[in-house]
Amino acid sequence: MTTKIQTVLLTGKTHTTGSRREGAPHGDDRLDLQLSTPGNAGNDIAFTAIQAHPAAEQLFAGAWSACYTGALGLVAKAKKVTLPSDMSVDIEVDLGKTGSAYFIQARIDVRMPGVAHDVAEAIAQAAHDVCPYSKAVHGNIDVATNIVATDAVAA
């Protein structure tokens, strides 16, 4: 059972692109890491532009976003859908309080330009069944997944 946060104390934000090799755009409060996919030859792990003291919420959002982006790719491949090169995932993880208890909650925005909204939504929801981070938090924290409107084609 999840509990609604009454007061947000801190928000960790990440932006992950489909390729993940180009890094994330710079922002005032975003953790900017170049991520790699395990098991791919020539895909060295690199941490670039690391902030001096990233918050745990930023690190969790970054790890989840990398994993979830990979899960989107796996689900799309199984559904024979080609993801656009400019696909992206934004995850925000809030640390907050309700009374004297601390909780986290998350928002996930998925952008798949050129993919029909219903197809993108089906891929995004199915990716939660693949991603270990999504499975770990399922039923434990509030998670809102949104497909951000883009110039998608009709279904």
Task: Cite the ranges covered by each PLM segment.
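Extended beta-strand/beta-hairpin segments
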Residues: 1-155
